[in-house]
């Protein structure tokens, strides 16, 4: 068996969720300059006791939270409009970003790639939201530091029309659909039969 490992992150794409009831998405848009992605799932397990023994074990998937960091979400009109929609901001008639208050951010699918030593991986989180970014800007010293934009991210599980419930799906470079992974968000996810998995 070959030894594999995943290295870095690239190819971030975002697809705005158009219809939360039907789970239809806009075409994924590539976002350049991915620096870092941190993901922390939130899965809680609780045991109820009765008759002096464990009675029911219940696990609940609450999605998760983390941070996605980019060097560039503002260099084009399209990126500024996309991220304004994602954080609940607006664009004015002159093309400026307005830090609007009280507007609901749009939900979206977040897609990215981790190259591998032998096998690469691409992942899609289906129902994400972000907040306006934090950043740390400082004077240029001996070397220029590019300002990094850090977006707090949350995601949650969804139930698709196929009956499948979950938060994300992965594809791998040895699978047939890998080359077209970023073409669209796949919402026709179904479980393999026992014979297909064996």
Feature annotation, model-predicted:
Residues 1-37, 194-198:
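Polar/acidic, low-complexity leader/linker segments enriched in S/T/G and N/D
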Residues 62-104:
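Ordered, amphipathic secondary-structure segments that act as subunit-interaction surfaces
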Residues 46-54, 87-97, 133-138:
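Short acidic (Asp/Glu) patches
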Residues 30-66:
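N-terminal interaction modules that seed assembly of large macromolecular complexes
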Residues 128-198:
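Mixed-charge, glycine-accented linear interaction segment located at domain edges/termini
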Residues 70-74, 114-118, 129-132, 155-159:
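Beta-strand elements of well-folded, non-transmembrane domains
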Residues 99-131:
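Short helix-loop boundary/capping segments
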């Amino acid at each position: 068996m070959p030894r594999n490992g995943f290295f870095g992150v690239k190819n971030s794409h975002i697809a705005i969720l158009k219809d939360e009831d039907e789970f239809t998405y806009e075409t994924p848009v590539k976002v350049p300059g991915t620096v870092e992605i941190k993901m922390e799932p939130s899965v809680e397990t609780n045991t109820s006791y009765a008759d002096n023994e464990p009675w029911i074990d219940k696990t609940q998937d609450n999605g998760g939270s983390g941070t996605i960091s980019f060097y560039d979400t503002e260099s084009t009109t399209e990126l500024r409009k996309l991220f304004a929609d994602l954080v609940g901001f607006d664009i004015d008639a002159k093309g400026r970003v307005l830090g609007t208050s009280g507007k609901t951010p749009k939900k979206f699918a977040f897609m990215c790639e981790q190259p591998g030593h032998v096998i690469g991986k691409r992942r899609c989180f289906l129902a994400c939201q972000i907040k306006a970014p934090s950043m740390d800007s400082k004077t240029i010293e001996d070397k220029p530091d590019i300002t990094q934009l850090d977006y707090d991210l949350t995601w949650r599980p969804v139930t698709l029309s196929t009956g499948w419930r979950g938060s994300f799906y992965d594809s791998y470079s040895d699978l047939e659909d890998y080359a077209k992974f970023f073409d669209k968000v796949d919402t026709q996810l179904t479980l393999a039969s026992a014979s297909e998995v064996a």
